[in-house]
Amino acid sequence: MCNFFTITVSPYLHTDKETEVYRLKKLWILFIFPALSAFFLLTFWEKAAVGTAKFTLSAMNPIKAVKYVINTDAPFSDTPVVNSEQNYTDNPTNPFEGFTLASPSPPPLKQPVYDTGCPIAVMTYVSAADDITYKKQNCYVKNVTKISRSEVESELLQETDFKVKKNSDEPQILIMHTHATESYQNHPELYYDPEYTCRDTDVTKNMVSVGKIITDKLNDLGYNTIQDATLHDYPNYNGSYDRSKVTVEKYLAQYPSIKVVLDVHRDAIERSDGTRIKPVVTINGKDCAQVMIISGADNGYLNMPDFKKNLRFASHFQNSMESLYPTFTRPILFDYRNYNQQLTTGSLLIEVGGHANTLEEAHNAAKLIAYSLADTFDGMQ
């Protein structure tokens, strides 16, 4: 009887080793497995609440796994964010059916720091008549020569000795650049980098780009204009005017129809303490670099017998700019300078802003220059 009971009730407890295995299995089922399950569940819940959990949803989507990131920096949204641009909702088995899976928002742009201790001062020059600045209508001329006031004023707004034809088949205007590599501030902040030279051989960033806008707009307005994009100041700055003189002479020989030669530059205005001046004015809601015409005078040694005719043209051009766009200009600088202005009676140098302006401000100004030139030429018809 006892032997039978032992055989039927304890068939699996035949050895001590088998008895130990049984006890371990029982312990795993009753205690260890539930404890581990609870631990993993609590760990996941805690990390999800903090917002730092990253896990793979392969169990939810056996077709394609994506990583789900809880972003505590972003405003609350029901839309999950995934670190892939691919949208997996095309798959009908996708558990995110009905959601829009978006790429994570890019991090906020780090604002560049330009506080180098080298400041830029914004200034709008307002013209006013005084002992050396003369006014006729809306034309202002700053006379720093020894030529009398009455003699200078008598030239202002007199008729030019040339007319620019509209809709001509032949070039009437030449836009060129003696200092073509002059460029502008490469950021909008009111500090400048003293290591940055404001010179650039890239024609999309230097004076060639400003001249191109003037050229294109004048052609649109019916005035046949050509542009020379030679970098006369590169690789050598010295001798720039000698080289640009040769260029202009070649164009005049090839196109004797040219009446106006405009040498487009930018200025460089800086105070003794190192502060750079940014001459700017807001016109039609846009910031524009203020401009200044330089008309040269002969001191007896510059070989400019017709310099007063250039001044006449400058005064008409200035008058148009100020009539159309008040405060757009600084007074014409009338000084003993040559700048190859002896080559035609319509030769002028124009400064479009300064090295503290931005390229965008210069481009905005270029459009107004073109409209003003067209207005000046329209008055000659």
Write out the residue ranges for each language-model feature.
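Extracytoplasmic/secreted envelope proteins and their assembly/folding machinery
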Residues: 211-215, 242-249, 311-314, 318, ...
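Active-site-adjacent mobile loop/cap segments within catalytic or ligand-binding domains
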Residues: 327-381
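N-terminal catalytic or cofactor-binding beta/alpha core of small enzyme domains
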Residues: 20, 31-259, 268-273, 367, ...
